[in-house]
């Protein structure tokens, strides 16, 4: 594997993890949004990754294939005084799992940091290679 390929692979991972962090942040920001523009509670989103290898290559980077809505059911919270409550007093809340999103955020952040370290290591190796002939 050429060193320049490592830059492409790690760079694609940085982009993918950045998108994952953005989606998790959006989910956390909307965890208490009872209604959206369509009048329904916010639906949590998830990032779907896909291998991004050149044809015939054994290795490759990663890309975000899609951002999908979570199929988890909405949460029901008993608030009989809320104007959005149904006849039984329950309000439909977003299906965001706050703890799961925090774990997802930490995982994406660690993955991002690991890929930055990969880039720094490869850069250091290339600089040392250039000084071998001196």
UniProtKB/Swiss-Prot annotation:
Reading the lineage from the top rank, the first entry is: Bacteria
Give compartment(s): Bacterial flagellum basal body
Q: Does the record bear Transferase in its keywords?
A: no
Spans traversing the lipid bilayer = none
The record's annotation in InterPro entries points to: Flag_bb_rod_N, Flagellar_basal_body_rod_CS, Flg_bb/hook_C_dom, FlgC
For this protein, the record's PROSITE patterns field holds: FLAGELLA_BB_ROD
- Pfam families on file: Flg_bb_rod (PF00460), Flg_bbr_C (PF06429)
Q: Indicate where this protein is primarily found.
A: other
Its cellular-component GO annotations read:
bacterial-type flagellum; bacterial-type flagellum basal body, rod
The keyword Methyltransferase belongs to this UniProt entry's keyword annotation:
no
Keywords of the record: Bacterial flagellum
The record's Gene Ontology biological-process terms are:
bacterial-type flagellum-dependent cell motility; bacterial-type flagellum-dependent swarming motility; chemotaxis
What is known about its subunit structure? The basal body constitutes a major portion of the flagellar organelle and consists of four rings (L,P,S, and M) mounted on a central rod. The rod consists of about 26 subunits of FlgG in the distal portion, and FlgB, FlgC and FlgF are thought to build up the proximal portion of the rod with about 6 subunits each.
Q: Which family does it belong to?
A: Belongs to the flagella basal body rod proteins family.
UniProt protein name: Flagellar basal-body rod protein FlgC
Origin organism is Escherichia coli (strain K12)
Lineage, highest ranks first: Bacteria, Pseudomonadati, Pseudomonadota, Gammaproteobacteria, Enterobacterales
